[in-house]
């Protein structure tokens, strides 16, 4: 589940590498202070114990998406999908669905279901899915106080050529970003790689919503935008955890929020797609904490 992007010009102190070393060596929580003109932000470096909890939460979130796939079919309502996921998260996994009652106004459901031209934060409802519908299911679970956040695109029946291509390119854009992750890389490098790939296929990147740091809190620093310029933004450090979750439109990039104050749609009603993973920056690259069995990318990527 992404966060609303808040613009801020900031610079990370060059002590970040030292902080990462201290966190790893002494299993101590370190906060990197990020200064902006108007406020102070912080990004947590996870300890060894926290990383293990993040791995557990990530696997559980991925498991929910693997479970729900067989239920995404013609005639089902997104409310029914929400109830199935809720029962599984609470009664089988003994977890907490993070979206439920989150935010202001409180989000009323346990998952987000974003259908066709809905970009993100779609609220499950009683409308039945029909053949050709594409739906993003966004799941976040809390286990032992730590969050795992991931989303996947599903299609009812066979996708149209347009929807199938958009879904594929969006997932490939996510993978392009993931493969960039390692200590020393800057967030602008990742955003640029995603933007360049999506726009090379004549798609647009949603800019109002972004990935985010994650851990004991649902949304932490840093903000991870899916566009940008190389060699800009925060520098990645071993032990950071964050999501990458590009939202890509078949039409123009502009969005609007519906009166429910949650559902975000494309202004031109063009199709939108999104995929999301929770990631850990390792000593040599990245670990995908929410990887599913149906994916063909490695869980651990070393550079």
Residue spans for each PLM region:
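Active-site neighborhoods and metal-handling regions in enzymes and metal-associated proteins
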Residues: 2-303
